[in-house]
Amino acid sequence: MKKKILFNGLGNRGWIGGLYYIKNIMFSCLQNENIMERFSLVLLIDPEHADIFDCFKENVNVDIRVYDGNNKIKLALYEMRLIWFGGVKYCYALELNKIGKLFKKKGIFWIPDFQHRTLPEFFGAEELAHKEKNDLAMTGSDNPMVLSSFDAARDLERFYPGHRCAVEVVHFVSYIEPEVCAITPELEQSVRDKFDLKRNYIYIPNQFWQHKNHIVMVEAIECLLKEG
């Protein structure tokens, strides 16, 4: 019987990017024959965001568990039953809360980036202390650590040179929905007509947060205009 990898999407409800990152890693696992020979995937998600993972509904190697509720004690009991009696071998991304500490040996950690170190002015004192405490606990463990970029891996070495975790870099890569593959030249032209786009354009989908540093994009466009 296959062991299971649990992907916990409940911890990313406040950040949609984290859920899409989980979706991407699940998709990558499903394409890996070695992983699929040994494991099946379990996703724990809330009803509000379950549709993000609809593409996995028909996959026999994915068990989607939709948990509806905000009671922390009931959720903890649900997670404990799922992990203890559900054949779960690994938990991603494990949070080092009271429940997570019970399953630390099964944990795979994830730190998206180290913004609180490089841009501390964007965080309050309490949040900074909380992030630093968590990062020290995770990097001081010998559990596997997933990072989202080689830049984050360099930051890990810079800020936590004595870390014990084994690091794997898994880049942010967008899962391409089937609908995108069906886009035709006619549909493209209809979008151009709708928004009166008579010339080539650049689409920048980043949200307007200060740390996204949109000025780099503006400066790049200025350079292109100067170069003709």
Predicted regions and their residues:
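Carbohydrate transferase catalytic cores enriched for Leloir-type hexosyltransferases
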Residues: M1-G228
